[in-house]
Amino acid sequence: NRMEATTTAVPTGSNKSGETQTSNVKVNVSSQSSKAFSTVKDSVVSVINLQKENTGDTDNILNSIFGDSESSSSKSSSDKLQTASEGSGVIYKKSGNTAYIVTNNHVVSGSNSLEVIMSNGKKLPAKIVGTDSVTDLAVLKINSAPVTTVASFGDSDNIKVGETALAIGSPLGSEYATSLTQGIISAKKRTIETSNSNGQGTGEATVIQTDAAINAGNSGGPLINLAGQVIGINSMKLSSSGSSTSVEGMGFAIPSNEVVSVIDELVKNGKINRPALGVTLVDLTAISSDQQKSILKLPSSVTGGSVIMSVNAGPAKTAGLKKYDVVTKVDGKSIKDTAELREALYKHKVGDTVKIGYYHSGKYKTTDVKLTKTASTN
């Protein structure tokens, strides 16, 4: 007789009864990213912008009807604070009873009061030490007693395109506090136009570009490297192009080296006193090649620089700089555009003298300029 074989094998992923089971396999899930996150996470906070509640005309009418428009209850209602917006910040220094937080200026702008929420959920009142709308940075202070971790800064000049970048913050608000996203450095120095909350242009900023996800609420939080060092402060994302084309993976952070110089001065003075030439400028690349020859009379070998469009009464005028002069060097170092010119100037202090190399009617000249304050420091 022919015998049929029967299998007694248990289906893969099942126990002897045929039920699906899970395996408890021990693996080392620790990675450079998770270690870096653990190093910094307790220094990252949510920043709550509190503003006075706007009681409408309806409330005033009802109060008038019931004869208590001037009552204390009405006054307390008009003074009630509510959450206007939320962002992120990072604790970077403890000094005695005070801890200092860096965040974005636009996160705290317009606030009547501020709160921070620590990584463990504890709420603390915060006060503004100083703000700077040009770089979109602000420094806050809180009681240092609950602070267990302080972040350290890395050298943003040494980052490389393609290296891992991690963004930490509260995307969409404190409900998602201490969220981590991972990407790479897409560009080390990207020049973008900046504007304030009213949409008015405030100049240009040189920022780090990353594809680590950055959303509303991430503003003010840290961009870190795999060593757990802060290499930038997340500031903005590009969500659409000029033609309304949807854009993904384009976030920007203020480089740590610039952050450190700004926040140190904010703690010291409460504001930034920037040196200036006393001119308005435009990139040479914005001028057509025909105009470069006919109006600026530039040699064809000159491909980078910043064109003076107007000269105010001040140091540049005293030094002999004129409209349509093309600045190509500061202190002997070539500059390719207005952003690099400003970067070179901002390394100096008000009252310093810098050597400006420029072309006037096609001839290269140099002049010494004593720097003055900018018209607006905030």
Regions found by a protein language model. Give the residues of each.
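Gly/Ser-rich catalytic serine loop of serine hydrolases
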Residues: S85-S88, A151-D155, V207-I224, I308-A319
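N-terminal activation segment of mature serine protease catalytic domains
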Residues: R2-I61, E70-K75, G87-S88, D264, ...
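Conserved active-site neighborhood of the chymotrypsin/trypsin-like protease fold
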Residues: A84-S85, I91-E175, K329, K333-A339, ...
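C-terminal recognition in membrane/secretory proteostasis and scaffolding
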Residues: N1-T12, K35, L226-A227, S261-N378
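Terminal peptide-recognition signature
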Residues: D42-V47, I65, G89, A99-T103, ...
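Gly/Ser-enriched beta-turn/beta-hairpin loop segments
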Residues: G56-I61, D68-A84, S119, T131-T135, ...
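A conserved glycine-rich beta-strand in the N-terminal activation segment of trypsin-fold
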Residues: V27-K35, S72-Y100, K122-K127, V150-S152, ...
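Active-site loop architecture of trypsin-fold serine endopeptidases
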Residues: G56-D57, S111-L114, T148, I168-Q182, ...
